[in-house]
Regions:
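Glycine-rich phosphate/pyrophosphate-handling loop used in enzymes and phosphotransfer proteins
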Residues: 1-170
Length: 170
């Protein structure tokens, strides 16, 4: 998990001195606050029922055994995803991953300076071997949004992020 290695973390801390940490949902400066108080109500409205699985009757899951989504893709959440994908904001993808670790796995978020760190969830045994982010087209933006979102999830679950085992086919 190189994202959370000492050198990477130090460089991000330095960046946050020059460019303070922002809310991925509304772009407000957060600094050392773990979450944005202005977005809490809007996010509560978009929150899904506390279930790890989306119902197959409502969503096409293909060959997947299950899938999870902490929010409906609308409003604040949609803006945050679009900010991460199209507005040169890789930090927004990481913040979304932190939020997913908190909501889907119950990870406590500890602030390390200005960086939110999801704590590993003790006793979590869901049978995960790794987190496999499905690559988005990162050639234009220079970073992979799903991979950035996966880093906090991997830290919370205690498994590696594997990025080199998928093959594009046409």
């Amino acid at each position: 998990m190189l994202y959370y290695s000492g050198l990477s973390r130090t460089l991000r801390q330095l960046r946050w001195v020059l460019y303070p940490r922002r809310c991925p949902f509304c772009d407000r400066v957060l600094g050392n606050q773990p979450a944005c108080p202005d977005c809490a109500d809007g996010l509560a409205e978009l929150r899904r029922a506390p279930s790890m699985r989306l119902r197959g009757s409502e969503h096409y899951l293909g060959r997947l055994d299950g899938a999870a989504a902490p929010y409906r893709y609308n409003g604040l959440v949609r803006r945050a995803v679009l900010r991460a994908k199209y507005q040169g904001a890789p930090w927004a993808a990481v913040e979304l991953g932190v939020e997913m670790a908190r909501l889907l796995f119950g990870s406590e978020i500890r602030m390390h300076g200005s960086e939110p760190l999801p704590e590993p969830v003790p006793g979590l045994d869901r049978g995960y071997d790794c987190i496999l982010p499905v690559p988005a087209s990162s050639k234009k933006r220079g970073y992979n949004v799903p991979e950035r979102m996966a880093q906090p999830l991997a830290r919370a679950v205690g498994v590696p992020v594997v990025t080199d085992c998928l093959l594009y086919t046409s």
